[in-house]
A protein has these predicted regions:
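Metal-dependent phosphohydrolase cores
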Residues: 1-173
């Protein structure tokens, strides 16, 4: 977990957001670094690995000039809800937003908030039955997060490959 946790902390601190330290304490105390994902990456540390995979994919595929700090925030916090064994998919995004903003006091801009809130929706252009989701109104950040999340869920990386990439990224910056 060492380099993975260091990478997440470094990336979030680089955003220089108010309450980032409170967010990092929440993530540590509530088990973000050891949490499992619900339907993929179902092993200890799965949420951490998945979130890093999502971030790496999103950074590589950012063709719309989305600010890097927004990509970091959305990707690393989109599954914050997995802490303490939470598994209710229907409230997945809203719980992640609530933990970051209300519990930790961390500020999300509008695009980040919407991307995290709706990241589980929009696998088709219709959204989910009975929701007020409309894919055409969402930002490029939401589209990037959705695509990166879907890619990681379907194509998990080997931990050693991630560790090598993180070492390279940490050395560069």
């Amino acid at each position: 977990m060492g380099i993975f946790k260091t990478f997440v902390e470094t990336q979030l601190r680089k955003t220089r957001r108010e309450h980032v330290e409170d967010l990092l304490v929440l993530m540590d105390q509530r088990g973000y670094y050891t949490a499992r994902c619900g339907r993929h990456h179902k092993y200890e540390g799965g949420t951490l690995q998945h979130s890093i995979e999502v971030l790496l994919y999103a950074l590589e595929h950012n063709t719309h000039g989305i600010p890097e700090d927004s990509i970091v925030v959305a990707c690393l916090l989109h599954d914050l809800c997995n802490v303490q064994g939470f598994r209710h998919i229907s409230r997945h995004g809203s719980r992640s937003v609530r933990l970051a903003t209300q519990v930790a006091g961390f500020h999300l801009n509008h695009d980040e908030y919407q991307a995290i809130l709706w990241h589980m929706h929009g696998w088709s252009e219709k959204g989910t039955l009975g929701s007020d989701f409309d894919a055409t109104t969402h930002s490029k950040l939401w589209q990037l997060l959705r695509d990166a999340d879907k890619h990681s869920a379907g194509h998990p990386m080997r931990r050693i490959d991630i560790a090598v990439r993180l070492q390279e990224l940490l050395r560069q910056k």
